[in-house]
């Protein structure tokens, strides 16, 4: 009965997917890398290759190796039983024919034979397609998770050229380049993971959950630092209208058949139902939304890992109560999350899940999301196994040059190209300044900013400081020298650039030499003048006991100078005496004038003795009428 139910479930899903395919035109985008033929010269060319969806592509890096085509077992469908070694000390890139077995099995046999990468040549003329890993089967068990080398599909004509060149004995050297496989427009990477809360879907589900647990630490560091913007997504289907009231639809869907997921155990009679998965997927979406609103989007990683360990299907704990206990333990507002989830029984659209269905459809350069798990970085689908370090490298490849966080420049992820020959960039070994900037995809030769001073130049052969404080940095690249306690410099803070020899020196500013003014007879030309050159200047003197006047370029007598000083002193003394006499005279006259004025004023109010004697008659005089 379980088998019958499983087939019924599969039939239902196929019908639903068929309806969806009729509604929207599905689009699958092939993610590519660059392949360059470096040697021999007559074969030099550039081609595209399709990145396989297994193994570990070297995102942000490149690989240079020699092409080897096997004498037998050219399809790689069985073990080679030997190790391929090129004639030259380079990594082996094994060329294999398409057909006969899984692509991943070819890569596995190539890896066992010592290959660093594998090229699979198409056997028909057609556009490139993506080599995917096989579904769960006995053939796939044991090697899919062990594949570490990158695999690339190339078109038939390019494969024919490589095959013929190798058979003619040519040493074919190619470069596999993944540095531009991930768009890197700015300093923030936006990535999304299409996943599922179901942990009973076999190897695919285990791979997803293992990745989430292992990548959690990296993801939260990047998110907390503001370097990335992560968004989780969940695939949902809808039930065809004619099946809405069927038992299958009711057990696998919510909101009256609008959002569905397959039965976890493929058994409609017992265990968990598809709608349980849809509801938990919705809850995890709402956890991210609510956490993002509180500026803690990284809490989603905590919730998903905690839910898997505490509420797994395998332990029969996959329930709403268990989920809400995890939410409470993470101090998330449970009422907001419930409001976000809404009523799963209502005959209405759920905007969160509706958005997910729309997002499944490809936009721009991104193809439709059709398989789980799918990782999208800067709107480009990641190819390869979901492995912590490999995914981190792909995310790091999405940063613009020089904007990568420190976690991306770890020696375990990339090679610091500035350590060898300074990356071919300009450097000032004396000041320990370099134009080489290590980046995840390589290096940049770019003049630096040191202590607030901007250097300008091409970054390869020259960099010179620019701006007001440029002279503090190695004297602005200009000439400078010190002798006998004197320092002269060709750098001036009053100008933003350039070098100019100071007065007393001549040259281009990078080198300056003392000018011998005495030899050039440009100074000390007066009669009786003597010139003595010095570093950065000169000294003029006069013969005898005369003094040299620099402004007039002349010599004067010292005694004449003393007479002038005595004459000046005498004149000043006379002026001082005259001033003193005037002051004394002025003071005397002013006092006499004041005495007279005071007496006049007082006489008006009280008669003075002399005036009284005239006005009072004498006693001897007779009185007359």
Curated annotation (Swiss-Prot):
Residues 1-26 form the signal peptide. Disulfide bonds join 418-436, 425-445, 447-463, 471-491, 478-499, 501-512, 542-555. One of its GO terms (cellular component) is Golgi membrane. It holds the Pfam family VSR_TRX. Residues 586-625 are cytoplasmic. Belongs to the VSR (BP-80) family. This is Vacuolar-sorting receptor 7.
């Amino acid at each position: 009965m379980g088998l019958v139910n499983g087939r019924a479930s599969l039939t239902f899903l196929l019908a639903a997917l068929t309806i969806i395919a009729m509604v929207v035109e599905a689009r699958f985008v092939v993610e590519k890398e660059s392949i360059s033929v470096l040697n021999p010269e007559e074969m030099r060319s550039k081609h595209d290759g399709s990145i396989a969806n297994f193994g570990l592509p070297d995102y942000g890096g490149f690989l240079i190796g020699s092409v080897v085509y096997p004498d037998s077992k050219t399809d790689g469908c069985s073990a080679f039983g030997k190790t391929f070694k090129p004639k030259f000390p380079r990594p082996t890139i094994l060329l294999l024919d398409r057909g006969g077995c899984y692509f991943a099995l070819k890569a596995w046999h190539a890896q066992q034979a010592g290959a660093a990468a594998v090229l699979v040549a198409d056997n028909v003329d057609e556009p490139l397609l993506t080599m995917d890993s096989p579904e769960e089967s006995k053939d796939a068990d044991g090697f899919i998770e062990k594949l570490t080398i990158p695999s690339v599909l190339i078109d038939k004509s390019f494969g024919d050229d490589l095959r013929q060149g190798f058979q003619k004995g040519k040493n074919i050297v190619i470069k596999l380049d993944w540095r531009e496989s991930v768009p890197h427009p700015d300093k923030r990477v936006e990535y999304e993971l299409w996943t599922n809360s179901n942990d009973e879907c076999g190897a695919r589900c285990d791979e997803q959950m293992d990745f989430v647990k292992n990548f959690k630490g990296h993801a939260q560091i990047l998110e907390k630092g503001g370097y990335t913007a992560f968004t989780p997504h969940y695939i949902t289907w809808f039930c065809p209208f004619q099946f809405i009231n069927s038992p299958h639809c009711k057990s696998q869907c919510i909101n009256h058949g609008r959002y569905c997921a397959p039965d976890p155990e493929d058994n409609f009679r017992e265990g968990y139902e598809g709608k349980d998965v849809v509801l938990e997927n919705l809850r995890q979406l709402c956890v991210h939304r609510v956490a993002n609103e509180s500026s803690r989007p990284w809490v989603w990683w905590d919730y998903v890992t905690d839910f898997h360990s505490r509420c797994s299907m395998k332990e029969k704990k996959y329930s709403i109560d268990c989920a809400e206990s995890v939410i409470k333990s993470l101090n998330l507002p449970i009422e907001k999350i419930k409001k976000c989830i809404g009523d799963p029984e209502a005959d209405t659209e759920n905007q969160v899940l509706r958005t997910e269905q729309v997002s499944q459809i490809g936009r721009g350069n991104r193809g439709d999301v059709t398989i789980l798990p799918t990782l999208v970085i800067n709107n480009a689908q990641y190819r390869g196994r979901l492995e912590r370090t490999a995914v981190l490298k792909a995310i790091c490849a999405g940063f613009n040059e020089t904007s990568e966080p420190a976690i991306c420049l770890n020696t375990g992820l990339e090679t610091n190209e500035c350590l060898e020959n300074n990356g071919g960039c300009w450097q000032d070994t004396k000041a320990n300044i370099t134009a080489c900037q290590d980046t995840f995809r390589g290096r940049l030769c770019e003049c630096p900013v040191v202590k607030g001073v901007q250097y300008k130049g091409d970054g390869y052969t020259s960099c010179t400081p620019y701006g007001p404080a440029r002279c503090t940095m190695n004297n602005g690249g200009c000439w400078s020298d010190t002798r006998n306690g004197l320092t002269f410099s060709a750098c001036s803070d009053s100008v933003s650039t350039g070098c100019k020899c100071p007065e007393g020196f001549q040259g281009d500013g990078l080198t300056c030499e003392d000018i011998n003014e005495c030899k050039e007879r440009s100074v000390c030309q007066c009669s009786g003048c003597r010139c003595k050159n010095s570093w950065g200047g000169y000294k003029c003197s006069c013969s005898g006991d005369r003094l040299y006047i620099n402004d007039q370029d002349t010599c004067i007598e010292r005694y004449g100078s003393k007479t002038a000083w005595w004459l000046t002193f005498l004149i000043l003394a006379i002026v001082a005496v005259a001033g003193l006499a005037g002051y004394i005279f002025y003071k005397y006259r002013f006092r006499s004038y004041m005495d007279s004025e005071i007496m006049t004023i007082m006489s008006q109010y009280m008669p003075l003795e002399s005036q009284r004697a005239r006005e009072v008659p004498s006693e001897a005089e007779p009185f007359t009428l």
